[in-house]
Amino acid sequence: MGTSVQVTPLSGAYGEGPLCYLLAVDGFRFLLDCGWTDLCDPSHLQPLAKVAPTIDAVLLSHADTMHLGALPYAMKHLGLSAPVYATEPVFRLGILTLYDYFISRRQVSDFDLFTLDDIDAAFQNVVRLKYSQNHLLNDKGEGIVIAPHVAGHDLGGTVWKITKDGEDVVYAVDFNHRKERHLNGTALGSFVRPAVLITDAYNALNNHVYKRQQDQDFIDALVKVLTGGGSVLLPIDTAGRVLEILLILEQYWAQRHLIYPIYFLTNVSTSTVDYVKSFLEWMNDSISKSFEHTRDNAFLLKCVTQIINKDELEKLGDAPKVVLASMASLEVGFSHDIFVDMANEAKNLVLFTEKGQFGTLARMLQVDPPPKAVKVTMSKRIPLVGDELKAYEEEQERIKKEEALKASLNKEEEKKASLGSNAKASDPMVIDASTSRKPSNAGSKFGGNVDILIDGFVPPSSSVAPMFPFFENTSEWDDFGEVINPEDYLMKQEEMDNTLMPGAGDGMDSMLDEGSARLLLDSTPSKVISNEMTVQVKCSLAYMDFEGRSDGRSVKSVIAHVAPLKLVLVHGSAEATEHLKMHCSKNSDLHVYAPQIEETIDVTSDLCAYKVQLSEKLMSNVISKKLGEHEIAWVDAEVGKTDDKLTLLPPSSTPAAHKSVLVGDLKLADFKQFLANKGLQVEFAGGALRCGEYITLRKIGDAGQKGSTGSQQIVIEGPLCEDYYKIRELLYSQFYLL
């Protein structure tokens, strides 16, 4: 039978919640993304908590909180310990995203769900892969190959292909078919007939306007506000879609010579741009080629200033400016505070470039019509002074003493246990009873052997050892001296990273610039003070879709082109999910599933695949033809079962010669161009390809329909002339002949 495949949504099904799914392939359990909302509610992770200890591998697709926000918490509290796989940009920018979120939370609350050390620990052993790199899993996952492919949504964004026994499971969420300023379009269209496609219905009900028109509307909206004396706030993510917006602003500001300042404000903004400059090979072809020829880096931003605090903004006062500030949800971070400052002025604009997460302030402001007033909580962290500082220091001193005492007791217990177990073997004063009972040959007045048992010489476990303990380390020696261990001289992976990429170590210090690191490492005793207030929303509010996802029309087209055997729909509103499910169900050859959260569906392939061993003698007589990455050949055989193993038996009789088989998929449009290059006059007429004066090619059969598996025929009509044989020969050259 086919490879066993089960899918269980843990979050992000029939809703727009964070993405987290369990995929089991022949018993090997993948966690597809590990997202969390900016609200950080641990109760949302209950489905994940039930299965976290059983996960064998984690695959991360994008570097934002909706895809990896819960990873540190899951590894610290839920027992998740599986290896994590991601591309280099998702790894690097994912850490910066969580750093930014942690700092934003700590500045307004006593956030303790995870720490900076937890973030570092979660990403410490991430296996980083390149696009299209096949990675073979070991041990329990033997035979499974995973490979990341371009998603087109953000830098390093991934469509995962998981292959077992020739069957592909494709996980493609938040993909974008469009080529953008810094990204290529998704590679999803290159996949053909995967066994299972897991994709999202997020944009199933939405259709985009033309990108050029959208960019122009975006710039016009900004310029209109700036020329009117107002300022613009763009709530953005830390290191994802903000990169595309930065390039749009940089390009238009440079072309129009605009003087209004643009600020990129996050706790890690300078570090983000520095890293992005080194990821040119992950961007689209035009950026890479431009750098090769002119050494001009697209992210050497001249019109955008990166800042990590609000001091620069406060110097400008009410002067017109554009501020890109995290977080996009407006729950915490610089965007929250700047919104409160700007909301009271009608001349200002808050422009959202992505949908707000459910339950957040951003989503509340995006409803139609928007609220006229909102309640917000303003919090800030201030240093402790006076009696509060003294009480804090006394409490810290008490905690230190308790920890020191506890450590001392633990060390004493370990010493006691060690001495107790070795006392009998190492102390010469302890006399073994087995050696104390010796026969006496000298005789005694009783004329017999006397057994003398000496007891009471074992020192108590609490006593001090009579001498310092000494343990001799034994080493192996050969004719040339002491044998060395080559592993002691190997360069560690993180050290290699440091040599290949400046400042690219895995620790916090190497990930951040000096200013950001100072924010994180600030240990000044402080407290958080909060107060609720009502904000009158007088400023303009607008939403423009710069999320970098394919729209509904494109998603349907991509699914039809890929033509999976089974389709699993996740991450979309109930309306969008049902709409896309009904649309795809019209294809009778496609099985469509839309599971609820914690509902397990079996999408095992209906195909019967068996493993057979072919002898060298048989293979030596086989003529193979290369087809893409594989080789194909025709073999006549009888399959029988012996000793519970499938083996290839020799044929009982000489098989009849088989008819020639042409393998391939011909597109008439491509063949038309091919014939034109050969000097033939070709044109389409009535759905057929007219070649010269007399020859016509028609493509007939069920396989002409997208996703169908029926037979396909190409008919050559015309007299047996010189053109006929020439065109037939050229047609044969487009196929593999068996």
From Swiss-Prot:
One of its GO terms (molecular function) is RNA binding. One of its GO terms (cellular component) is mRNA cleavage and polyadenylation specificity factor complex. Pfam families: Beta-Casp (PF10996), CPSF100_C (PF13299), Lactamase_B_6 (PF16661), RMMBL (PF07521). It comes from the Eukaryota. SMART domains: Beta-Casp, Lactamase_B. InterPro entries: Beta_Casp, CPSF2, Cpsf2_C, CPSF2_MBL, Metallo-B-lactamas, RibonucZ/Hydroxyglut_hydro, RMMBL. One of its GO terms (biological process) is mRNA 3'-end processing by stem-loop binding and cleavage. It is found in: Nucleus. Keywords: mRNA processing, Nucleus, RNA-binding. Belongs to the metallo-beta-lactamase superfamily. RNA-metabolizing metallo-beta-lactamase-like family. CPSF2/YSH1 subfamily. CPSF is a heterotetramer composed of four distinct subunits 160, 100, 70 and 30 kDa. CPSF plays a key role in pre-mRNA 3'-end formation, recognizing the AAUAAA signal sequence and interacting with poly(A)polymerase and other factors to bring about cleavage and poly(A) addition. This is Cleavage and polyadenylation specificity factor subunit 2.
